[in-house]
């Protein structure tokens, strides 16, 4: 079946306008971005093929330029467009967190942290510095490590928190293995940071561990 033979309400753009973006499948959303198919495949068929070939929509989005462009129907122009869309999405999430509002949505915070850390190949330790009303003052990647570990120094965290005049912190780091379950080392360093920051009356509100498509909150586990 070609797109021309589909009823209007089944066309991705028309379906989005009538029912909203949530009603569309991953392939239909990607089809709107791609706009055209290739010889022998309409744009929806091409989108479905690409998602299956890459393994998921996320893996397609995180592919390198070389990996992306070697697929039929894709090229450098589409790669540039996609990177621009992803960067705008990340900036939107960052702006939402930094616009001066208090952090009241753990899910939104988790979504932003995941967008920053999820696809990094090396472990990185990320901090949101907050004021006494839990508004974001500053965010930083403070430490980066090897593929499986980052050296986190409590003295440096305290120093940066005092520099930003922070009243509270939210911590996050990624597991490049993709497994979000916190290790005993993760729990130990979190406890050391809680104790060190407590000496200067700065609280840790949460520590998120970001994996592949999942994340774990220390606060939700009752560990903070």
UniProtKB/Swiss-Prot annotation:
Pfam families: RadC, UPF0758_N. Belongs to the UPF0758 family. One of its GO terms (molecular function) is metallopeptidase activity. This is UPF0758 protein VIBHAR_00653. Gene3D superfamilies: 5' to 3' exonuclease, C-terminal subdomain, Cytidine Deaminase, domain 2. Keywords: Hydrolase, Metal-binding, Metalloprotease, Protease, Zinc. PROSITE patterns: MPN, UPF0758. Residues 102-224 form the MPN domain. It comes from Vibrio campbellii (strain ATCC BAA-1116). The keyword Hydrolase applies. One of its GO terms (biological process) is proteolysis. PANTHER family: DNA REPAIR PROTEIN RADC (PTHR30471), UPF0758 PROTEIN YEES-RELATED (PTHR30471:SF3). A motif (JAMM motif) lies at residues 173-186. Zn(2+) binds at residues 173, 175, 186. InterPro entries: MPN, RadC_JAB, RuvA_2-like, UPF0758, UPF0758_CS, UPF0758_N. Signal peptide: none annotated.
């Amino acid at each position: 079946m070609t797109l021309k033979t589909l009823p209007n309400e089944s066309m991705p753009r028309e379906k989005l306008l009538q029912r909203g973006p949530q009603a569309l499948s991953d392939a239909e959303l990607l089809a709107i971005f791609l706009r055209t198919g290739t010889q022998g495949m309409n744009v929806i068929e091409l989108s479905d093929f690409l998602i299956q070939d890459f393994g998921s929509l996320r893996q397609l989005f995180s592919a390198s330029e070389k990996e992306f462009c070697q697929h039929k129907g894709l090229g450098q122009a589409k790669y540039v467009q996609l990177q621009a869309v992803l960067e705008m999405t990340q900036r939107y999430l960052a702006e939402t967190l930094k616009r001066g509002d208090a952090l009241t949505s753990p899910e939104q915070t988790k979504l932003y942290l995941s967008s920053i850390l999820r696809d990094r190949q090396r472990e990185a330790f990320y901090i949101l510095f907050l004021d006494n009303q839990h508004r974001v003052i500053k965010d930083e990647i403070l430490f980066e490590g090897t593929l499986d570990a980052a050296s986190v120094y409590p003295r440096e965290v305290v120093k940066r928190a005092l520099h930003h005049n922070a009243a509270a912190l939210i911590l996050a780091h990624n597991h490049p293995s993709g497994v979000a379950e916190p290790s005993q080392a993760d729990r130990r360093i979190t406890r050391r940071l809680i104790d060190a920051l407590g000496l200067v009356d700065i609280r840790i509100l949460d520590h998120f561990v970001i994996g592949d498509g999942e994340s774990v909150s220390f606060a939700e586990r009752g560990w903070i």
